[in-house]
Amino acid sequence: MDRQGAVGQLRRTVEEFAGTYCDIDDQWCVALSGGSDSLALTAVAAQLRSTTAFIVDHGLQSDSAAVAETARKQAISLGCVDAQVLCVQIDPPFGPKGGLEAAARAARYAVLGANRNGPVLLAHTLDDQAETVLLGLGRGSGARSIAGMRPHDPPWCRPLLGVRRSVPRAACHELGLNAWQDPHNTDCRYTRTRLRLEVLPLLEDVLGGGVVEALARTATALREDTELIDTFAAQALPNICAGSGLHARALAALPDAVRRRVIRGWLLNGGATGLTDKQIRGVDTLVTAWRGQGGVAVGSTLRGQRLIASRYDGVLTLHCAPV
């Protein structure tokens, strides 16, 4: 493979990532959509290690089966030892948050996780990271939501997270690869598409460029802070647990950020889902502003149920209630 130009840049990037995060004898998988980002990643990955390509067919477009089969054949031609089409079904209702996009993403990660035989390479780029940060800012769900995607979140690997989207596109051109153009990427009914096509270009124009890189740097800094607070929360937890609950007095002694991180982890371990910063702070008031108030409702993984975080006899507890 030509080591010059975009292909060479991608190869060096993936080699450096593998040297940092992957065992030397790891085989790996790559999630391939057929688009330029994942196609270029597949081309490079297959030259470096034994690679299995997984193409997830969500069945959301009339030609999705044909697109998936084309991508499968491309993967084999690029040197993958195996390439499989994995079919998933996305049925409404799509859930309370994120709609169709979130449901498709959840199904995709689930089927990739169930079929993988090693780390899974994902082709998210620096531009994807910037879009993710902006989405998190819009939701206002706390620092974690704007900390972006981790480069390495086992089994998920994102070796291109520091690379602009233009590089894999150029690599496909260098390799003579015909990448699939996902119509969703130009459909402005989707929030991420509008961010990509309208918001980010406007920010680049108004702020004089460098916005994508700046957003990604912000995500990295916040992610480092978030991971440190996670460590402090894990260290504090053994002295706070009261069976399946939490001692309110011991919680109150913790720094604010650490206390709320403990509460977040406790809620998630108890089956909470779709947590917002507002909900976590609401539960926090059961510790810091206790006046005998009622519990705080949060989403549950159980259909038709929600969880109620309450305080009884100085202990935070969780119980289920019908929606």
From Swiss-Prot:
Ligates lysine onto the cytidine present at position 34 of the AUA codon-specific tRNA(Ile) that contains the anticodon CAU, in an ATP-dependent manner. Cytidine is converted to lysidine, thus changing the amino acid specificity of the tRNA from methionine to isoleucine. It is found in: Cytoplasm. GO terms for biological process: tRNA modification. One of its GO terms (molecular function) is tRNA(Ile)-lysidine synthase activity. This is tRNA(Ile)-lysidine synthase. The keyword tRNA processing applies. CDD domains: TilS_N. ATP binds at residues 33-38. The keyword Nucleus does not apply. Its main location: cytoplasm. InterPro entries: Rossmann-like_a/b/a_fold (IPR014729), TilS/TtcA_N (IPR011063), tRNA_Ile_lys_synt (IPR012094), tRNA_Ile_lys_synt_N (IPR012795), tRNA_Ile_lys_synt_subst-bd (IPR015262). Keywords: ATP-binding, Cytoplasm, Ligase, Nucleotide-binding, tRNA processing. It holds the Pfam family ATP_bind_3. It comes from Mycobacterium leprae (strain TN). GO terms for cellular component: cytoplasm. Belongs to the tRNA(Ile)-lysidine synthase family. It catalyses: cytidine(34) in tRNA(Ile2) + L-lysine + ATP = lysidine(34) in tRNA(Ile2) + AMP + diphosphate + H(+). The N-terminal region contains the highly conserved SGGXDS motif, predicted to be a P-loop motif involved in ATP binding.
